């Protein structure tokens, strides 16, 4: 057993506390933009405090956690860190709004082998921007510098969001019925799902990521941040009786739409009602991917599907378009017979 000739520090072991403090200083103004009146105290406490909004009579908390998946691999490889924070918030807050919940607060977890303050600042500023878009407060998080756990510049992200909904207004799909209409909200791209397959397509096709598609590089199509639908849908919920909403994420149409349908109902989707964004056609062609697999892996241009009474379609579409959404009638709910699949794409 030998004793070091010079004293060891945490920094010698690979953990730079000063870098962590520099990151906190860098993000303070961005985090401040997300503040809600219910938040108590400031960033940096042992626990973050948040009151329930007083407008709720019987508030129910709704929680969700998610990550960005292997989209991070592309972001790291191409040094495009600004938008993955938006993706992180979107994946959580879009899941909450499906229940009718207003996102209240968000916490993030950023883990890396060696903290790069510039990269981490870009990521957290993106998280703050996502919180602004969702209307929730970034009230805390964890930055974990863990030498030996991650290689090189790699890092990982996870997010946790809590929202609130009036107990009597929870949307759980039980009101969905035969004859309901289905409205689609356009996605901004692949969002944050299917990236292991996307990376495989890039590998086998040997495609140039800078290849121009519809006026911008392929890599920009792929890394376009996930669309956040929260504020538009909260407006819709104020004025319309929405029966169900489905966030089209991993598992695509086949897996996500049935999650909000009663057993005796199926969704009939009219594939002629929209054109896939060019990036999905490129993936299908260059990966030789079947149409079934495309609908099972990707959103194919549809980020959210909404079920509501058929006589409310026109007013709902008008409202959503006023809120800046590209929305259209994509199909309807029909009676399901026996063991039929719960999604039928025509």
Curated annotation (Swiss-Prot):
Domain of life the protein comes from:
Bacteria
Where does this protein act, in terms of pathway? Purine metabolism; IMP biosynthesis via de novo pathway; 5-amino-1-(5-phospho-D-ribosyl)imidazole from N(2)-formyl-N(1)-(5-phospho-D-ribosyl)glycinamide: step 2/2
* E.C. numbers: 6.3.3.1
Is Nucleotide-binding one of the keywords? Answer: yes
Q: Does the keyword tRNA processing apply?
A: no
Enzyme class, top EC level, equals: ligase
Give a GO cellular-component term. cytosol
- Please give one Gene Ontology molecular function term for this protein: phosphoribosylamine-glycine ligase activity
Mind telling me which residue stretches traverse the membrane in this protein?
none
Q: Which NCBIfam families match?
A: purM
Name of the protein in question: Phosphoribosylformylglycinamidine cyclo-ligase
Q: Which organism is it from?
A: Shewanella halifaxensis (strain HAW-EB4)
């Amino acid at each position: 057993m030998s004793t070091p000739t010079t004293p060891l520090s945490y920094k010698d072991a690979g953990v730079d506390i000063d870098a962590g403090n520099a990151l906190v200083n860098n993000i303070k103004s961005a985090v401040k933009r997300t503040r809600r009146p219910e938040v108590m105290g400031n960033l940096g406490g042992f626990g973050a405090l948040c009151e329930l909004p007083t407008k709720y009579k019987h508030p129910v908390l709704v929680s969700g956690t998610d990550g960005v998946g292997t989209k991070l691999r592309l972001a790291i490889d191409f040094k495009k860190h600004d938008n993955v924070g938006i993706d992180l918030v979107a994946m959580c807050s879009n899941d909450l709004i499906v229940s009718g919940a207003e996102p209240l607060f968000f916490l993030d977890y950023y883990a890396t082998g060696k903290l790069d303050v510039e990269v981490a600042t870009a990521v957290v500023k993106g998280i703050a921007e996502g919180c602004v878009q969702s209307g929730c407060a970034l009230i805390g998080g964890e930055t974990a510098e863990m030498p030996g756990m991650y290689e090189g510049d790699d890092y990982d992200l996870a997010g946790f969001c809590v929202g609130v909904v009036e107990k009597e207004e929870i949307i759980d799909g039980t009101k969905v019925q035969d004859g309901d209409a289905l409205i689609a909200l356009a996605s901004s791209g692949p969002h944050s799902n299917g990236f292991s397959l996307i990376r495989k397509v890039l590998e086998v096709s040997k495609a140039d990521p800078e290849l121009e598609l519809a006026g911008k590089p392929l890599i920009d199509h792929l890394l376009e941040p996930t669309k956040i639908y929260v504020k538009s849908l909260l407006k819709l919920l104020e004025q319309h009786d929405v029966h169900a909403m489905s966030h089209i994420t991993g598992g695509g149409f086949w897996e996500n739409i049935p999650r909000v349908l009663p057993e005796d109902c199926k969704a009939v989707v009219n594939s002629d009602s929209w054109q896939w964004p060019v990036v999905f056609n490129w993936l299908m062609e260059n990966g030789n991917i079947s149409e079934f697999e495309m609908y099972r892996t990707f959103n194919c241009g549809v980020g959210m599907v909404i079920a509501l009474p058929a006589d409310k379609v026109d007013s709902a579409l008008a409202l959503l378009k006023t809120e800046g959404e590209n929305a259209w009638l994509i199909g309807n709910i029909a009676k399901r017979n026996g063991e039929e699949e719960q999604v039928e794409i025509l």
